[in-house]
Design a protein with these regions (language model features):
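N-terminal [4Fe-4S]-dependent radical SAM core
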Residues: 2-16, 20-71, 116-117
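C-terminal scaffold of the Radical SAM
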Residues: 4, 59-70, 89-114, 118-405, ...
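Local cysteine-cluster metal-coordination motifs and their immediate loop/turn environment
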Residues: 74-89
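Structured DNA-binding interfaces in DNA transaction proteins
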Residues: 390, 412-413, 425-426
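Short amphipathic alpha-helical interaction segments
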Residues: 403-419
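A short, conserved structural fragment
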Residues: 419-429
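Minor-groove-contacting beta-hairpin "wing" of winged helix-turn-helix DNA-binding domains
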Residues: 430-434
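Short, amphipathic alpha-helical interaction segments positioned at domain boundaries
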Residues: 436-455
Length: 455
């Protein structure tokens, strides 16, 4: 269907392999480049299994760090590959859902001990199109989660359990099954309410079914819903984008994710662009759309809590906040990435390998990084700076000094530079981006991260 940081078709910023955030990781062409046109920075992996996840997990207890209280599950099946999507997904013509679920349940059992110190507080099921999984298989998956994990926080309503949904695959029966299994939040991929723009994106759903999907979720007792939109679609006007926002608001969801269209490598959308089939939206139009988003949603009571995410008070995506605040999470399914005890890993993104090459219930892994203080600090700056709450200056400077005493001095100097340029707020106890800074978030983060490099 569609962590951290990207143009997805969902509100979940799914972490990628090791340390690389999805958007804004590459060096921009100027000191404060707009995040609207940042290339994706992903390590060049051959995508073949290189490690046994069991060995990685067995090493984790040797390092300090909180146990994971969050879980990401990736379900790769789609009925059609959207042209802008670079997430691992397959159009399954061989009906591999059942063997996949058998394998997934085994993996969930294998990794459970690393989250067993307490209840799970958040679960996010992404894809792919999770709502395409057959209802009887959803029942099995939800039962397996309840058997292997403590879901008391989620059952009480204090925790969060999100499932991504395509509007065309939402049914009353499926929503009832999800709610009975503890799901209390759905993320509906609308992308646009204009049929011609959906056609450009190769999204196969009727725009009117977005409101229907949200209504069915509510009727089943799933109290929280999020709607995802994309702007900067070729041919899209500022007026059309504002109309999309107002239609989404009329549906009454408490959370919206609004992403600019990014031309990711190895996608059909990028291939079409290179063939000259369309012209990308001008950056000044994208900036106008970005400003319209903030203004329109703020007036409706949805505040920006992250560069591309807006919510009414208390409706923020708690699972996303785990990523952005540098927390720990378990991960299961092909291409899923996890972070526990300073270790980061990415499961194989090939379903055939996922089904056939795991050992002891664990998935084969294509990338792994062990604990690294400097890398962790860089990631915290990149992700936390995108939050409206910003960074605790004293904490980040203390940790920078542990990496290298002079690094803290350089980092503070870089932050003061951002303050002087009006990109970071004047409150020096927390480094928060201003409205102008949010437009240039990746560039500001790069300035701070570069300050950590040895001179």
């Amino acid at each position: 269907m569609h962590t951290p940081l990207q143009t997805p078709a969902t509100d979940a910023p799914r972490p990628h392999a090791a340390s690389t955030p999805r958007r804004g990781g590459a060096k921009p062409p100027r000191p404060y480049a707009s995040p609207l046109r940042q290339p994706t920075a992903i390590p060049a992996l051959d995508q073949r299994p290189v490690a046994d996840a069991g060995a990685i997990f067995r090493a984790i207890p040797a390092f300090p760090g909180p146990a994971a209280s969050s879980l990401y599950i990736h379900i790769p099946f789609c009925f059609h590959k959207c042209h802008y999507c670079d997430f691992y997904s397959i159009v399954d013509t061989r009906d591999r859902q059942e063997p996949f679920l058998d394998r997934l349940i085994g993996e969930l059992a294998a990794i459970a001990p690393w989250g067993a110190s307490g209840p799970l507080r958040t679960i996010f099921v992404g894809g792919g199109t999770p709502s395409l999984l057959r209802p009887e298989l959803w029942k099995r998956l939800l039962a397996a989660l309840a058997e292997r994990y403590d879901l008391s926080e989620i059952a009480s309503g204090r925790g969060e359990f999100t499932v991504e949904c395509n509007p065309e695959t939402v049914s009353p029966g499926l929503m009832d099954i999800l709610r009975a299994g503890g799901v209390n939040r759905v993320s509906v991929g609308a992308q646009s309410f204009e049929a011609r723009h959906l056609k450009t994106l190769e999204r196969w759903h009727d725009p009117e079914n977005v409101a229907r999907a949200v209504a069915l979720a509510r009727a089943a007792g799933i109290e929280r819903q999020s709607v995802d939109l994309i702007f900067g679609i070729p041919g899209q006007t500022a007026a059309e984008w504002e109309r999309d926002l107002r239609i989404a608001l009329s549906i009454g969801t408490g959370h919206m994710s609004c992403y600019d269209l990014t031309y990711e490598p190895n996608t059909a959308m990028t291939a079409r662009l290179r063939r000259g089939e369309f012209t990308p939206a001008p950056e000044d139009l994208e900036v106008e759309m970005f400003d319209t988003t903030v203004r329109t949603l703020r007036a409706a009571g949805l505040e920006r809590y992250e560069v591309s995410n807006f919510a009414r008070p208390g409706a923020e995506c708690r699972h996303n906040l785990v990523y952005w605040r540098g927390g720990s999470w378990l991960a299961a399914g092909p291409s899923a990435s996890g972070h526990v005890g300073g270790h980061r890993w990415k499961n194989t993104p090939r379903l055939d390998d996922y089904l056939s090459r795991g050992t002891g219930g664990f998935s084969p892994v294509v990338d792994h990084e062990g604990p690294d203080r400097r890398r962790d600090l860089v990631e915290r700056i990149m992700t936390a700076l995108r939050l409206a709450e910003g960074l605790d200056a004293a904490e980040i400077l203390r940790d920078a000094a542990l990496v290298e005493p002079a690094a803290a001095v350089r980092l503070r100097r870089a932050a003061l530079k951002g303050v002087g340029e009006g990109l970071i707020g004047a409150d020096l106890s927390r480094w928060r981006l201003t409205d102008a800074g949010f437009l240039l978030a990746d560039g500001v983060a790069l300035e701070l991260m570069t300050a950590l490099d040895p001179v």
